[in-house]
Amino acid sequence: MTNIRKTHPLLKIVNNAFIDLPAPSNISSWWNFGSLLGICLILQILTGLFLAMHYTADTTTAFSSVTHICRDVNYGWIIRYMHANGASMFFICLFMHVGRGLYYGSYTYMETWNIGVILLFATMATAFMGYVLPWGQMSFWGATVITNLLSAIPYIGTNLVEWIWGGFSVDKATLTRFFAFHFIFPFIIAALAMVHLLFLHETGSNNPTGISSDADKIPFHPYYTIKDILGALLLILALMTLVLFSPDLLGDPDNYTPANPLSTPPHIKPEWYFLFAYAILRSIPNKLGGVLALVLSILILILMPLLHTSKQRSMMFRPISQCLFWILVADLLTLTWIGGQPVEHPYIIIGQLASIMYFLLILVLMPVASTIENNLLKW
Protein backbone atom coordinates (compact mmCIF):
# COMPACT_ATOMS: atom_id res chain seq x y z
CA MET A 1 0.00 0.00 0.00
CA THR A 2 1.29 3.49 -0.88
CA ASN A 3 2.17 5.73 2.03
CA ILE A 4 -0.75 7.98 3.09
CA ARG A 5 1.43 11.08 2.85
CA LYS A 6 1.75 10.45 -0.89
CA THR A 7 -1.94 9.80 -1.56
CA HIS A 8 -3.99 11.97 0.83
CA PRO A 9 -4.95 15.23 -0.99
CA LEU A 10 -3.81 17.52 1.85
CA LEU A 11 -0.83 15.52 3.09
CA LYS A 12 0.39 15.20 -0.51
CA ILE A 13 0.82 18.99 -0.69
CA VAL A 14 2.76 19.04 2.61
CA ASN A 15 4.82 16.04 1.46
CA ASN A 16 5.79 17.64 -1.85
CA ALA A 17 6.69 20.92 -0.16
CA PHE A 18 8.51 19.81 3.02
CA ILE A 19 9.32 16.08 2.96
CA ASP A 20 10.03 14.54 -0.46
CA LEU A 21 10.98 17.87 -2.04
CA PRO A 22 14.17 17.44 -4.11
CA ALA A 23 16.65 20.04 -2.82
CA PRO A 24 20.18 20.95 -3.97
CA SER A 25 22.83 19.11 -1.93
CA ASN A 26 25.00 22.20 -1.41
CA ILE A 27 22.71 24.99 -0.15
CA SER A 28 24.37 26.82 2.75
CA SER A 29 23.01 28.39 5.94
CA TRP A 30 22.03 31.45 3.87
CA TRP A 31 19.10 29.30 2.66
CA ASN A 32 17.83 28.95 6.25
CA PHE A 33 16.21 32.39 6.36
CA GLY A 34 13.10 31.41 4.37
CA SER A 35 12.02 28.95 7.06
CA LEU A 36 13.07 31.40 9.79
CA LEU A 37 10.80 34.04 8.24
CA GLY A 38 7.95 31.52 8.34
CA ILE A 39 8.64 30.90 12.03
CA CYS A 40 8.81 34.67 12.70
CA LEU A 41 5.46 35.16 10.96
CA ILE A 42 3.76 32.40 12.98
CA LEU A 43 5.28 33.78 16.19
CA GLN A 44 4.09 37.33 15.36
CA ILE A 45 0.56 36.14 14.54
CA LEU A 46 0.32 34.16 17.80
CA THR A 47 1.78 36.83 20.10
CA GLY A 48 -0.24 39.49 18.25
CA LEU A 49 -3.45 37.52 18.73
CA PHE A 50 -2.92 37.36 22.49
CA LEU A 51 -2.04 41.07 22.62
CA ALA A 52 -5.21 41.92 20.66
CA MET A 53 -7.25 40.15 23.36
CA HIS A 54 -6.21 42.85 25.85
CA TYR A 55 -5.51 45.88 23.65
CA THR A 56 -8.05 48.65 23.01
CA ALA A 57 -7.73 50.67 19.78
CA ASP A 58 -8.90 53.98 21.19
CA THR A 59 -6.81 57.12 21.67
CA THR A 60 -7.90 57.55 25.29
CA THR A 61 -7.11 53.99 26.40
CA ALA A 62 -4.54 52.55 23.91
CA PHE A 63 -1.45 53.58 25.92
CA SER A 64 -3.04 52.45 29.20
CA SER A 65 -4.06 49.10 27.70
CA VAL A 66 -0.45 48.40 26.69
CA THR A 67 0.68 49.31 30.23
CA HIS A 68 -2.08 47.03 31.56
CA ILE A 69 -0.80 44.17 29.37
CA CYS A 70 2.72 44.60 30.76
CA ARG A 71 1.68 44.99 34.41
CA ASP A 72 -1.50 43.00 34.99
CA VAL A 73 -1.91 40.32 32.31
CA ASN A 74 -0.29 36.95 33.08
CA TYR A 75 3.00 36.89 31.16
CA GLY A 76 1.72 39.93 29.24
CA TRP A 77 5.14 41.58 29.45
CA ILE A 78 6.87 38.66 27.73
CA ILE A 79 4.18 38.45 25.02
CA ARG A 80 4.48 42.19 24.36
CA TYR A 81 8.29 42.15 24.18
CA MET A 82 8.36 38.97 22.08
CA HIS A 83 6.04 40.72 19.63
CA ALA A 84 8.05 43.96 19.55
CA ASN A 85 11.46 42.27 19.31
CA GLY A 86 10.03 39.53 17.09
CA ALA A 87 9.50 42.30 14.52
CA SER A 88 13.22 43.14 14.74
CA MET A 89 14.18 39.48 14.25
CA PHE A 90 11.72 39.33 11.34
CA PHE A 91 13.48 42.23 9.60
CA ILE A 92 16.97 40.87 10.32
CA CYS A 93 15.89 37.61 8.63
CA LEU A 94 14.25 39.58 5.78
CA PHE A 95 17.39 41.60 5.07
CA MET A 96 19.57 38.46 5.18
CA HIS A 97 17.10 36.64 2.89
CA VAL A 98 17.03 39.47 0.33
CA GLY A 99 20.82 39.89 0.57
CA ARG A 100 21.26 36.16 -0.13
CA GLY A 101 18.99 36.53 -3.18
CA LEU A 102 21.07 39.45 -4.48
CA TYR A 103 24.42 37.72 -3.89
CA TYR A 104 23.54 34.37 -5.42
CA GLY A 105 21.36 35.68 -8.29
CA SER A 106 18.13 34.15 -6.97
CA TYR A 107 16.26 37.09 -8.55
CA THR A 108 16.39 35.30 -11.92
CA TYR A 109 13.34 33.36 -10.65
CA MET A 110 11.17 36.34 -11.63
CA GLU A 111 7.78 35.35 -10.15
CA THR A 112 9.28 34.22 -6.85
CA TRP A 113 11.39 37.39 -6.63
CA ASN A 114 8.57 39.82 -7.47
CA ILE A 115 6.22 38.24 -4.93
CA GLY A 116 9.11 38.48 -2.45
CA VAL A 117 9.36 42.24 -3.10
CA ILE A 118 5.58 42.58 -2.57
CA LEU A 119 6.01 40.60 0.68
CA LEU A 120 8.75 43.02 1.76
CA PHE A 121 6.47 46.03 1.12
CA ALA A 122 3.56 44.34 2.95
CA THR A 123 5.76 43.51 5.95
CA MET A 124 7.08 47.08 6.12
CA ALA A 125 3.52 48.47 5.99
CA THR A 126 2.43 46.06 8.74
CA ALA A 127 5.37 46.95 10.99
CA PHE A 128 4.74 50.68 10.51
CA MET A 129 1.06 50.35 11.49
CA GLY A 130 1.97 48.17 14.46
CA TYR A 131 4.39 50.82 15.73
CA VAL A 132 1.52 53.34 15.86
CA LEU A 133 -0.68 51.16 18.11
CA PRO A 134 0.94 51.73 21.56
CA TRP A 135 0.09 55.44 21.04
CA GLY A 136 3.29 56.78 22.57
CA GLN A 137 4.97 59.98 21.40
CA MET A 138 7.00 58.28 18.67
CA SER A 139 3.94 56.26 17.58
CA PHE A 140 1.90 59.43 17.08
CA TRP A 141 4.59 61.58 15.49
CA GLY A 142 5.92 58.72 13.37
CA ALA A 143 2.40 58.18 12.03
CA THR A 144 1.98 61.92 11.40
CA VAL A 145 5.30 62.32 9.57
CA ILE A 146 5.12 59.17 7.43
CA THR A 147 1.46 59.51 6.39
CA ASN A 148 2.11 63.20 5.64
CA LEU A 149 4.62 62.14 2.97
CA LEU A 150 1.67 61.20 0.75
CA SER A 151 0.69 64.89 0.61
CA ALA A 152 3.70 65.29 -1.72
CA ILE A 153 1.71 63.51 -4.45
CA PRO A 154 0.58 66.23 -6.87
CA TYR A 155 -3.10 67.24 -7.00
CA ILE A 156 -4.59 64.42 -4.88
CA GLY A 157 -1.97 64.39 -2.08
CA THR A 158 -3.81 66.42 0.59
CA ASN A 159 -7.14 64.66 0.01
CA LEU A 160 -5.39 61.29 0.12
CA VAL A 161 -3.72 62.03 3.47
CA GLU A 162 -6.98 63.23 5.06
CA TRP A 163 -8.74 60.15 3.68
CA ILE A 164 -6.12 57.88 5.31
CA TRP A 165 -6.31 59.85 8.58
CA GLY A 166 -10.12 59.83 8.61
CA GLY A 167 -10.00 63.49 9.66
CA PHE A 168 -7.74 66.53 9.65
CA SER A 169 -5.02 64.96 11.81
CA VAL A 170 -3.87 61.60 13.15
CA ASP A 171 -6.62 60.81 15.65
CA LYS A 172 -9.09 58.18 16.90
CA ALA A 173 -10.17 57.12 13.38
CA THR A 174 -6.53 56.67 12.30
CA LEU A 175 -5.67 54.46 15.27
CA THR A 176 -8.77 52.27 14.81
CA ARG A 177 -8.13 51.67 11.10
CA PHE A 178 -4.42 51.03 11.68
CA PHE A 179 -5.34 48.36 14.23
CA ALA A 180 -7.77 46.76 11.76
CA PHE A 181 -5.15 46.75 9.00
CA HIS A 182 -2.38 45.60 11.35
CA PHE A 183 -4.56 42.62 12.31
CA ILE A 184 -5.47 41.56 8.75
CA PHE A 185 -2.13 42.13 6.99
CA PRO A 186 -0.17 39.20 8.54
CA PHE A 187 -2.76 36.82 7.10
CA ILE A 188 -2.34 38.43 3.67
CA ILE A 189 1.43 38.02 4.15
CA ALA A 190 0.92 34.33 5.02
CA ALA A 191 -1.15 33.82 1.84
CA LEU A 192 1.48 35.61 -0.27
CA ALA A 193 4.22 33.51 1.36
CA MET A 194 2.40 30.37 0.20
CA VAL A 195 2.28 31.75 -3.37
CA HIS A 196 5.99 32.64 -2.99
CA LEU A 197 6.67 28.96 -2.13
CA LEU A 198 4.40 27.74 -4.93
CA PHE A 199 6.45 29.62 -7.54
CA LEU A 200 9.74 28.57 -5.92
CA HIS A 201 8.75 24.90 -6.12
CA GLU A 202 8.00 25.31 -9.84
CA THR A 203 11.74 25.84 -10.43
CA GLY A 204 13.40 24.39 -7.33
CA SER A 205 15.91 26.23 -5.16
CA ASN A 206 18.95 28.06 -6.44
CA ASN A 207 22.32 27.10 -4.88
CA PRO A 208 25.57 28.95 -4.03
CA THR A 209 27.25 28.13 -7.36
CA GLY A 210 24.32 29.36 -9.46
CA ILE A 211 24.70 26.22 -11.60
CA SER A 212 21.76 23.83 -12.17
CA SER A 213 21.62 21.23 -9.40
CA ASP A 214 19.24 18.86 -11.19
CA ALA A 215 21.98 16.22 -11.38
CA ASP A 216 22.53 16.24 -7.62
CA LYS A 217 19.38 16.48 -5.49
CA ILE A 218 18.69 15.20 -1.97
CA PRO A 219 15.33 14.88 -0.14
CA PHE A 220 14.37 17.88 2.00
CA HIS A 221 13.61 15.57 4.95
CA PRO A 222 15.68 14.70 6.99
CA TYR A 223 18.61 16.80 5.69
CA TYR A 224 17.08 20.26 5.58
CA THR A 225 14.40 19.72 8.23
CA ILE A 226 17.14 19.14 10.82
CA LYS A 227 19.09 22.10 9.44
CA ASP A 228 16.00 24.32 9.71
CA ILE A 229 15.38 23.15 13.28
CA LEU A 230 18.93 24.20 14.22
CA GLY A 231 18.32 27.60 12.59
CA ALA A 232 15.01 27.95 14.45
CA LEU A 233 16.67 27.17 17.80
CA LEU A 234 19.33 29.81 17.17
CA LEU A 235 16.64 32.33 16.18
CA ILE A 236 14.64 31.64 19.34
CA LEU A 237 17.83 31.83 21.43
CA ALA A 238 18.65 35.25 19.96
CA LEU A 239 15.07 36.50 20.36
CA MET A 240 14.70 35.32 23.96
CA THR A 241 18.12 36.73 24.90
CA LEU A 242 16.93 40.10 23.61
CA VAL A 243 13.49 39.83 25.26
CA LEU A 244 14.73 38.68 28.67
CA PHE A 245 17.91 40.75 29.03
CA SER A 246 17.36 44.01 27.16
CA PRO A 247 13.82 44.22 25.79
CA ASP A 248 14.00 47.99 25.19
CA LEU A 249 17.40 47.95 23.46
CA LEU A 250 15.92 48.55 19.99
CA GLY A 251 12.95 50.68 21.09
CA ASP A 252 12.65 54.43 21.54
CA PRO A 253 12.41 55.91 25.08
CA ASP A 254 9.98 58.54 23.69
CA ASN A 255 7.39 55.81 23.23
CA TYR A 256 7.07 55.52 27.02
CA THR A 257 5.52 59.01 26.97
CA PRO A 258 1.82 59.03 26.01
CA ALA A 259 1.06 60.66 22.63
CA ASN A 260 0.73 64.44 22.87
CA PRO A 261 -0.22 66.35 19.69
CA LEU A 262 0.93 69.61 21.33
CA SER A 263 4.54 68.54 21.97
CA THR A 264 6.84 67.38 19.18
CA PRO A 265 9.79 65.11 20.18
CA PRO A 266 13.20 66.63 19.33
CA HIS A 267 14.12 63.77 16.97
CA ILE A 268 11.35 61.93 15.16
CA LYS A 269 12.67 58.63 13.84
CA PRO A 270 11.18 55.25 12.91
CA GLU A 271 12.25 51.83 14.21
CA TRP A 272 15.84 50.80 13.34
CA TYR A 273 14.80 48.62 10.39
CA PHE A 274 13.41 51.64 8.49
CA LEU A 275 16.31 53.99 9.21
CA PHE A 276 18.17 53.29 5.93
CA ALA A 277 15.08 54.31 3.91
CA TYR A 278 14.43 57.27 6.24
CA ALA A 279 18.01 58.49 5.66
CA ILE A 280 17.47 58.33 1.87
CA LEU A 281 14.18 60.25 2.30
CA ARG A 282 15.86 62.99 4.36
CA SER A 283 18.88 63.31 2.08
CA ILE A 284 16.80 65.00 -0.64
CA PRO A 285 15.72 68.59 0.19
CA ASN A 286 12.60 68.36 -2.01
CA LYS A 287 9.53 66.65 -0.48
CA LEU A 288 8.29 64.84 -3.60
CA GLY A 289 11.86 63.91 -4.58
CA GLY A 290 12.46 62.44 -1.13
CA VAL A 291 9.28 60.37 -1.27
CA LEU A 292 10.19 59.06 -4.73
CA ALA A 293 13.70 58.15 -3.56
CA LEU A 294 12.22 56.40 -0.51
CA VAL A 295 9.89 54.26 -2.64
CA LEU A 296 12.56 53.59 -5.28
CA SER A 297 15.08 52.48 -2.64
CA ILE A 298 12.95 49.33 -2.17
CA LEU A 299 11.25 49.20 -5.58
CA ILE A 300 14.71 49.06 -7.22
CA LEU A 301 14.76 45.36 -6.21
CA ILE A 302 12.20 44.65 -8.95
CA LEU A 303 14.78 45.87 -11.50
CA MET A 304 17.47 43.42 -10.34
CA PRO A 305 16.76 40.78 -13.06
CA LEU A 306 16.98 43.52 -15.72
CA LEU A 307 20.26 44.87 -14.29
CA HIS A 308 21.89 41.41 -14.36
CA THR A 309 24.51 41.62 -17.12
CA SER A 310 26.80 38.79 -15.98
CA LYS A 311 27.01 35.47 -17.81
CA GLN A 312 27.18 33.79 -14.41
CA ARG A 313 24.23 33.71 -12.07
CA SER A 314 25.92 33.74 -8.67
CA MET A 315 28.61 36.09 -7.33
CA MET A 316 30.51 33.07 -5.98
CA PHE A 317 33.14 33.26 -8.76
CA ARG A 318 32.99 37.04 -9.36
CA PRO A 319 35.42 38.89 -7.04
CA ILE A 320 34.75 42.43 -8.39
CA SER A 321 30.99 42.04 -7.91
CA GLN A 322 31.62 40.56 -4.45
CA CYS A 323 33.57 43.68 -3.44
CA LEU A 324 30.77 45.93 -4.69
CA PHE A 325 28.15 43.82 -2.91
CA TRP A 326 29.90 44.20 0.45
CA ILE A 327 30.41 47.93 -0.21
CA LEU A 328 26.62 48.08 -0.72
CA VAL A 329 26.10 46.32 2.64
CA ALA A 330 28.46 48.82 4.33
CA ASP A 331 26.59 51.66 2.60
CA LEU A 332 23.25 50.40 3.94
CA LEU A 333 24.72 50.17 7.45
CA THR A 334 25.97 53.76 7.06
CA LEU A 335 22.49 54.88 5.97
CA THR A 336 20.97 53.08 8.97
CA TRP A 337 23.33 54.96 11.30
CA ILE A 338 22.63 58.32 9.59
CA GLY A 339 18.85 57.77 9.77
CA GLY A 340 19.08 57.76 13.56
CA GLN A 341 21.15 60.97 13.77
CA PRO A 342 19.83 64.56 13.95
CA VAL A 343 19.67 66.65 10.75
CA GLU A 344 22.91 68.63 11.17
CA HIS A 345 26.46 68.81 9.83
CA PRO A 346 28.25 66.40 9.12
CA TYR A 347 25.37 63.89 9.08
CA ILE A 348 23.51 65.64 6.23
CA ILE A 349 26.38 65.35 3.74
CA ILE A 350 27.27 61.79 4.83
CA GLY A 351 23.63 60.78 4.28
CA GLN A 352 23.54 62.42 0.85
CA LEU A 353 26.77 60.73 -0.24
CA ALA A 354 25.59 57.35 1.07
CA SER A 355 22.25 57.76 -0.75
CA ILE A 356 23.98 58.60 -4.05
CA MET A 357 26.34 55.65 -3.51
CA TYR A 358 23.38 53.30 -2.92
CA PHE A 359 21.72 54.04 -6.26
CA LEU A 360 25.05 54.32 -8.09
CA LEU A 361 26.17 50.86 -6.90
CA ILE A 362 22.96 49.11 -7.92
CA LEU A 363 22.19 50.95 -11.17
CA VAL A 364 25.68 51.58 -12.58
CA LEU A 365 28.68 50.03 -10.83
CA MET A 366 27.42 46.45 -10.37
CA PRO A 367 26.17 46.00 -13.99
CA VAL A 368 29.46 47.52 -15.28
CA ALA A 369 31.50 45.22 -13.01
CA SER A 370 29.57 42.22 -14.36
CA THR A 371 30.38 43.24 -17.95
CA ILE A 372 34.08 43.66 -17.06
CA GLU A 373 34.10 40.18 -15.47
CA ASN A 374 32.50 38.71 -18.62
CA ASN A 375 35.33 40.20 -20.71
CA LEU A 376 38.00 39.02 -18.27
CA LEU A 377 36.71 35.46 -18.71
CA LYS A 378 36.87 35.86 -22.53
CA TRP A 379 33.56 34.07 -22.93
Curated annotation (Swiss-Prot):
The cytochrome bc1 complex contains 11 subunits: 3 respiratory subunits (MT-CYB, CYC1 and UQCRFS1), 2 core proteins (UQCRC1 and UQCRC2) and 6 low-molecular weight proteins (UQCRH/QCR6, UQCRB/QCR7, UQCRQ/QCR8, UQCR10/QCR9, UQCR11/QCR10 and a cleavage product of UQCRFS1). This cytochrome bc1 complex then forms a dimer. Its cofactor is heme b. It is found in: Mitochondrion inner membrane. Belongs to the cytochrome b family. Keywords: Electron transport, Heme, Iron, Membrane, Metal-binding, Mitochondrion, Mitochondrion inner membrane, Respiratory chain, Transmembrane, Transmembrane helix, Transport, Ubiquinone. The keyword Heme applies. It comes from the Eukaryota. Heme b b566 binds at residues 97, 196. GO terms for molecular function: metal ion binding; ubiquinol-cytochrome-c reductase activity. One of its GO terms (cellular component) is mitochondrial inner membrane. A ubiquinone binds at residue 201. Its main location: mitochondrion. Heme 1 (or BL or b562) is low-potential and absorbs at about 562 nm, and heme 2 (or BH or b566) is high-potential and absorbs at about 566 nm. PROSITE patterns: CYTB_CTER (PS51003), CYTB_NTER (PS51002). It comes from Cephalophula zebra. This is Cytochrome b. The chain crosses the membrane at residues 33-53, 77-98, 113-133, 178-198, 226-246, 288-308, 320-340, 347-367. Component of the ubiquinol-cytochrome c reductase complex (complex III or cytochrome b-c1 complex) that is part of the mitochondrial respiratory chain. The b-c1 complex mediates electron transfer from ubiquinol to cytochrome c. Contributes to the generation of a proton gradient across the mitochondrial membrane that is then used for ATP synthesis. Heme b b562 binds at residues 83, 182. Binds 2 heme b groups non-covalently. It is a multi-pass membrane protein. GO terms for biological process: mitochondrial electron transport, ubiquinol to cytochrome c.
